[in-house]
Amino acid sequence: MTAEDSATAMNSDPTVGSSTKVPEGVAGAPNEAALLALIERTGYTMVQENGQRKYGGPPPGWEGPHPQRGCEVFVGKIPRDVYEDELVPVFETVGRIYELRLMMDFDGKNRGYAFVMYCHKHEAKRAVRELNNYEIRPGRLLGVCCSVDNCRLFIGGIPKMKKRGEILEEIAKVTEGVLNVIVYASAADKMKNRGFAFVEYESHRAAAMARRKLMPGRIQLWGHQIAVDWAEPEIDVDEDVMQTVKILYVRNLMIETTEETIKKSFGQFNPGCVERVKKIRDYAFVHFTSREDAVHAMNNLNGTELEGSCLEVTLAKPVDKEQYSRYQKAAKGGGGSAEAVAQQPSYVYSCDPYTLAYYGYPYNALIGPNRDYFVKTGSIRGRGRGAAGNRTPGPRGSYLGGYSAGRGIYSRYHEGKGKQQEKGYELVPNLEISPVNPVAIKPGTVAIPAIGAQYSMFQAAPAPKIIEDGKIHTMEHMISPIAVQPDPATAAAAAAAAAAAAVIPAVSTPPPFQGRPITPVYTVAPNVQRIPTAGIYGASYVPFAAPATATIATLQKNAAAAVYGGYAGYIPQAFPAALQVPIHDVYQTY
């Protein structure tokens, strides 16, 4: 065969012609030639779908299952004009790439981030170590971290009498790719579940499709409406770290089971091997002196019964405190203004957290009986699930969801040890009054705006020692300097008021303070029409029987008072003074 015959045969072969076809998503790209050269060099496929361009998946000659969880890394801070022809040579230096997914925009540029999946887990970890902050362009650094491949859904609204097998069977009927179902027994009645379950799927895609299918209003299970959301993905702990763990996580305990009973049960194989036990509701952490004793106890006691309850025993997962704090913020949509603190499991709040978050720290500090926990963080949404599935406060919003099956992350309860209780603000130092329900309330000085020296006769009343005295006598102390006495001419004044009502002008000056009244407006003289004034809390006047003070005389001589005629002997009820008012009168707490 000559060279011409060979060329003719190649041109007539349809497979050869199809191999030169430009893949969809590559045709028309700014760097089309570079992408085609990359495909020819590596033999990988490239296709664009659903706003992302997939390179590989699987690679040429791949045989075997899909790479395990933890083989994918997230790549961020990618320049908008960088594509696979520059990314692949960088990331293939640390391992074999199974798949690279570059998020694309409609204008043909990338969206600044991508996902790279390796064939093995150790290659992904190496990529994080070596390629994070890699300078892809002068002055442009890539951000590389482990990707959270969430394959777990939270499903609520499950009938409490359903068993794990029934739930697994029902979920598998309506969704695909179900691997496992995690169901927690009720702490009070082990024959019932807690009304929710965690469903694990074989891949993130399968979980996403199941979530879309199970959205509320589309499917009912056992005739019940269900709630579906992403669960908090289980935190991945390095295998080398897990090899040093000597703490066991024990769940499904009875509420009545004591720490002494748990210590005796787990220490039966080697007396003295258990250092201590920390029990929280229906789960516990058992600390051993050596890892061998912990593993031996786990193998022998997992699945056994203790005081009528079947135990689930696993190795606890240690988590770096700083890493866990960052993870919590990312998983719940970013932290709020509250400082990150340890989660306190299972506290029943007697007050509405939506309302408390509005008033802020000083008001939260007065609310009982759980005020110590309200001031630490504002609970709006995104409620986390602790190791035993209990609700705990979390910041508003949910990026990866607000629920977690928990697997014994024992660093949580270490956070709160030896921590000082936060105290509220003491507005008036060194003054104690009787506690109420059972909060100790500090009195505070409430300064009403527009205080003037001309009203010096209105002195602040002494702070009462008892709250009840403050309620009863506050107004009495306020009006006592005026020396209000019964006026025999009250009836005549009322008649004059009725006659002058039509000629009294309205005051157009807006009130200088648009706040709510601290106390109600009182009218001392009956049947006297109120005059609209530029008062701060209301329009009302108090009559004087004997205006003897210099201040009142000045008021009567004031030209502005002349237009009021017979009302010049009255003074506004809204006293511009400083007075002592108990805080509970300002912010009602009961």
Swiss-Prot record:
All residue ranges annotated as the RRM domain in the record: 71-149, 151-233, 246-318
Gene3D superfamilies reported in the protein's UniProt record: 3.30.70.330
Pfam families recorded: RRM_1
Disruption phenotype: Homozygous knockout mice die before birth.
Primary location recorded for the protein, binned into one broad class: nucleus
Modified residues (Omega-N-methylarginine): R396, R407
Region ranges (Disordered): 1-25
Any one of the GO BP annotations: cytidine to uridine editing
Keywords: Cytoplasm, Methylation, mRNA processing, mRNA splicing, Nucleus, Repeat, RNA-binding
Cystine pairs: none
Database matches in InterPro entries: HnRNP_R/Q_splicing_fac (IPR006535), Nucleotide-bd_a/b_plait_sf (IPR012677), RBD_domain_sf (IPR035979), RBM47_RRM1 (IPR047044), RBM47_RRM2 (IPR034440), RBM47_RRM3 (IPR034445), RRM_dom (IPR000504)
Modification Asymmetric dimethylarginine, positions: R396, R407
Subunit: Homodimer. Interacts with A1CF. Interacts with APOBEC1; form an mRNA editing complex. Interacts with RBPMS.
Protein task: Single-stranded RNA-binding protein that functions in a variety of RNA processes, including alternative splicing, RNA stabilization, and RNA editing. Functions as an enzyme-substrate adapter for the cytidine deaminase APOBEC1. With APOBEC1 forms an mRNA editing complex involved into cytidine to uridine editing of a variety of mRNA molecules. Through the binding of their 3'UTR, also stabilizes a variety of mRNAs and regulates the expression of genes such as the interferon alpha/beta receptor and interleukin-10. Also involved in the alternative splicing of several genes including TJP1.
Similarity section: Belongs to the RRM RBM47 family.
Name this protein carries in UniProt: RNA-binding protein 47
Organism name: Mus musculus (Mouse)
